[in-house]
Regions:
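Conserved strand-to-helix beginnings and helix N-cap segments that scaffold or border functional pockets
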Residues: 159-160, 190
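Alpha/beta hydrolase fold serine-hydrolase catalytic domain that processes acyl esters and thioesters
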Residues: 1-7, 20, 47, 63-146, ...
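Charged, compositionally biased non-catalytic regions
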Residues: 1-44
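Extended, Lys/Arg-enriched charged tracts that mediate electrostatic binding to polyanionic substrates
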Residues: 26-80
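Active-site signature of alpha/beta-hydrolase-fold catalytic machinery across serine-
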Residues: 161-165
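Gly/Ala-rich beta-loop-alpha elbow adjacent to hydrolase catalytic centers
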Residues: 150-155, 159
Length: 395
């Protein structure tokens, strides 16, 4: 049973975009792939993204609340393997491509994932909109030896959920391939997801903002595993999220290798590296993946130093979105008041966060929960704005 090559995986990840854009029919789109997989219009899956699921039955609200209704669009394709992939299937899920899709990422909250842990509610809702169609397509084919789940952007998040579901529901052998995918769930999700999939190939560009969100406590799978870093960029760049060959650099271009061992890998151990930031060094920070990771590590170090990590992690699993940052901000206010050492540590963290978000300060005297929450909102807002721009630029 073969693994998809980087080149083949990236080409397959691009197919749903071409279907979505109406570029020819699937037989023509996949002509260069016909040696390995057969695709057809009948194996196209419609999915709903964006909006608020409970409002699907109230069309009148489409006019009243712009973006509240979810849209149904060509969202995924299924390919039947041949040759070295005989008796295997591939499921390729596209990312978001319009503003309406992006409200999915603001469906703040958690839901139970197929692997029994907690994941992003918006991603779960989107996956649930295609699950029944996946079941129907699977019932039409004989039991596959393996299923390859592939996706870019939001499609990578859904491919991860799909892989977990296929393992839980059918006990199929599953490989997962993602390009520029966001974090899907909390720590336990990442651990279980990494343990369930037979192989995970997580591909990123250094400047792609989408894999940087959602922020901790969301964690990438495989937990403490590795990613395939396909370029050498460091600063956040909107174009770094592009899938297409005319992108800069474009995942189709950077994943053109025929073997995975030809690509650079990078370990994801930063969350477990102790980091204590000093306020006087804040201007070293920049809007980059390196500093996004370092700031997350500094926050976790602070919570470990104050014996709060277990408490905060538990609260993350039961409190949604901004409510979690309310709780976290109150914890940090108490920490700052506890001792001069902790006050210095909190101030250093906040100073670096503000510089990261493009809001440098000369001094920080206000250490209230209200101010700390505003700092979190500033950082989150900056990352989401840039990630949204990157998503809207995808073509």
């Amino acid at each position: 049973m073969a693994t998809l090559t980087p080149k083949l995986a990236s080409q397959i990840a691009n197919i749903p975009y071409m279907v979505y854009q109406g570029i020819g029919d699937l037989e023509l789109i996949s002509k260069s792939l016909t040696r390995h997989f057969s695709f057809s219009e009948s194996a196209t899956i419609q999915g709903k993204t964006g909006g608020i699921p409970v409002l699907d039955s109230v069309p009148l609200l489409r006019k009243v609340i712009p973006g509240a209704m979810r849209t149904s669009e060509a969202f995924a394709v299924i390919g039947i393997g041949k040759g070295v992939y005989q008796d295997e299937l591939v499921v390729s899920i596209r990312g978001t491509q319009n503003a309406n899709d992006w409200i999915t990422n603001f469906n703040i909250g958690y839901k139970g994932a197929p692997n029994g842990s907690i994941a992003h509610a918006g991603f779960i809702n989107s996956f649930n909109s295609i699950k029944n169609q996946l079941k129907q397509h699977l019932s039409k084919n004989r039991t596959p030896k393996k299923i390859h789940c592939v996706g870019h952007s939001l499609g990578g998040a859904l491919a991860s959920l799909c892989a977990d579901w296929l393992k839980s529901e059918y006990s199929y052998r599953v490989n997962l391939y993602t390009f520029g995918a966001p974090r899907v769930g909390l720590e336990q999700y990442a651990i279980k997801s990494g343990n369930r999939a037979d192989k995970i190939f997580r591909c990123t560009h250094g400047g792609d903002p989408v894999p940087m969100i959602p922020l901790w406590p969301f964690v990438h799978a495989p937990y403490q595993g590795q990613e395939y870093r396909l370029d050498s960029s460091t600063k956040v760049c909107i174009s770094a999220h592009a899938m297409s060959a005319d992108g800069n650099p474009g995942y189709l271009n950077t994943a053109s290798a025929e073997e995975w061992r030809a690509l650079k890998t990078r370990a994801n151990q930063y969350l477990h590296t102790p980091v204590r930031l000093k306020f006087e060094h804040r201007n070293q920070a920049s809007f980059s993946e390196y500093w996004a990771n370092k700031i997350s590590a500094a926050l976790i170090t602070l919570l470990k130093d104050t014996l709060l990590l277990a408490t905060v992690t538990a609260q993350a699993a039961i409190s949604s979105g901004l409510t979690f940052y309310d709780l976290l901000s109150r914890h940090l206010e108490k920490v700052a008041k506890a001792s001069k050492v902790r006050e210095i540590q909190v101030r250093g963290l906040l100073g670096h966060m503000l510089v990261f978000a493009g809001k440098p300060v000369i001094a920080i005297e206000d250490m209230t929960a209200s101010f700390i929450r505003k700092v979190f909102e500033t950082v989150i807002g900056k990352l989401y704005r840039v990630a949204k721009q990157a998503i809207l630029a995808v073509r």
